Design a protein with these regions (language model features):
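N-terminal small-residue-enriched
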Residues: 1-487
Length: 487
């Protein structure tokens, strides 16, 4: 969208904030359009559309933060909101424990647009929903599933950011997601299979071409058949230790929960504890702590094509960047804001994002990815494994408030016997302590198996915000892992 009027209003808000006593101010105008559709058991269950537009002003005054927002986009409202933000900052300063300090950054200027081949909003609604109807019908062609679902989400966000330091940039982010799931019930068991990922959806920064590449209709019968077959599959062994090979879609969530959240510097500093606590990766461990084996390298990269954490600039006007969280097993990097980076005497790597115009930006995962190794294909990795369990597609998880002790359950498991995949395993689970678990990783598949996954539902903050994060991974092997529920 053209931002000519909004740019003038942003400048006005910044001027008002400075006049009222702000030493720093920024203004964000955000328009977000979202459409979700679900087909369930042969019927169109929901088609939801939303369109929101508004602006927020963030300031520092008397050494403290203030923020205010509105969906009334007028000159008078720009003045009112800016003045209110300064008033809130000055009130907050009464009980501040330290002055806000910001790491320096060059003023952001320019424009960024998600690369899109086929605009999902330009496709006829009948065609979008028609694909879901066909995929759902293909699952229902299999005898046995109790419930079938197919869904998509299309998402567009247009943002304008100006700051009192001279930043002036705009961005258009387009995302598309899709998936299918089947549930089967029998003998007190509920089994679920979803594709391509847990929750029946994965999402990337892309157009409708992203949906088409997953071939939902072609994969639908297999997913339904697996859900039914799991009802009579072997149960997961109870409380034993064995080798575990995790599929890349499961590793995506493992990275998210046991690396992505603990490297958020606000958690590590103890400034943030909402939605699952602080972090065991405290600053004195930076650069020396053994997070995993030499095989494990995890990258922070907001430039990765297709990633939900890809952008031109974060919501503080810091440019996209790339670096390491873990390099050859050693913890070396955080996700940082300008304020938290200043606390460590470092430049920000640009990870502050807000959930729309009405919320303050928070440190959020960008694209935090397990980098590929040299173990070849998944078939090669299985062939190199004498005994163990292959697990894929998350079903449940639990992790403590330091991000150390965890348990994950997956939808599907398969025995590994003498280098081949064997019988199905139902209700597979594994548990561990984060550095011990990553320390047991002795193989990661090669780049040909690496894939970028998306998590469009990451919660953080109070009031709560939903973030969109990207996680690349290839299948990997872990030795001496505790599997099965402890009885």
């Amino acid at each position: 969208m053209p931002f000519a009027v909004e740019r003038d209003l942003a400048r006005r808000a910044l001027d008002t904030a400075r006049t009222r006593g702000a030493t720093y101010a920024d203004a964000r105008f955000v328009r977000r359009q979202v459409e979700d559709a679900v087909v369930k058991n042969g019927h169109v269950d929901t088609i939801d559309r939303s369109d929101t537009f508004g602006f927020g002003v963030r300031v520092v005054a008397d050494g403290a933060w203030g923020f205010a927002a509105s969906q009334v986009v007028t000159a008078d409202e720009a003045d009112r909101v800016a003045a209110l933000a300064v008033e809130i900052a000055k009130a907050s300063a009464v009980c501040k424990t330290a002055e806000v300090r910001l790491a320096p950054v060059a003023p952001a200027t320019g424009a960024f647009r998600s690369p899109v081949v086929q605009d999902p909003f330009a496709l006829a609604l009948e065609d979008r929903v028609g694909l879901l109807v066909a995929a759902d019908a293909a699952m229902r062609s299999v005898k046995g599933p109790r419930t079938t679902r197919a869904n998509y989400e299309i998402w567009r966000e247009e943002k304008l950011f100006l700051s009192s330091e001279g930043a002036d940039c705009e961005q258009t982010i387009v995302e598309t997601g899709c998936g299918i799931s089947a549930e089967a019930v029998g003998d007190g068991e509920l089994q679920i299979r979803s594709y391509p990922a847990a929750g029946g959806r994965t999402q990337n920064q892309a157009g409708w071409e992203f949906v088409e590449k997953w071939d939902l209709v072609g994969n639908a019968p297999r997913i339904a058949e697996e859900a039914v077959a799991l009802l009579t599959a072997k149960p997961c062994p109870q409380d034993v230790r064995t080798t575990v090979v995790l599929g890349d879609a499961q590793l995506m969530l493992q990275v998210h929960e046991s690396c992505g959240h603990p490297i958020e510097l606000d958690r590590a500093l103890g400034w943030e504890a909402a939605y699952a606590g602080t972090s065991f990766l405290t600053p004195e461990r930076l650069g020396t702590f053994r997070y995993g084996s030499d095989t494990v390298s995890i990258r922070i990269d907001s430039t990765t094509p297709g990633g939900l954490g890809t952008f031109g600039w974060d919501d503080e006007g810091v440019p996209a960047s790339e670096g390491w969280a873990v390099k050859d097993g050693v913890f070396v990097g955080y996700l940082m804001s300008r304020e938290t980076a200043a606390a460590l005497g470092k430049p920000s790597n640009g990870t502050m994002r807000a959930d729309g115009w009405a919320r303050l930006p928070l440190i959020r995962m960008t694209n935090v990815s397990l980098m590929p190794g040299d173990a070849g294909s998944l078939a090669d990795l299985i062939a190199d494994t004498d005994d163990g369990i292959y697990m894929e597609t998350n079903r449940s998880w639990s992790i403590d408030d330091k991000r150390l002790n965890f348990q994950f359950g997956t939808q599907l498991g398969r025995e590994i016997r003498k280098g081949t995949l064997g019988d199905l395993v139902r209700n597979p689970t594994y548990t561990g302590i984060t550095p011990e678990f990553w320390g047991s990783c002795d193989a990661v598949c090669s780049a040909s198996e690496w894939r970028m996954w998306g998590t469009p539902n990451c919660g953080k903050g109070q009031p709560g915000q939903i973030g969109h994060t990207g996680h690349g991974a290839a299948p990997a092997r872990f030795r001496n892992v505790r599997v099965g529920v402890v009885r």
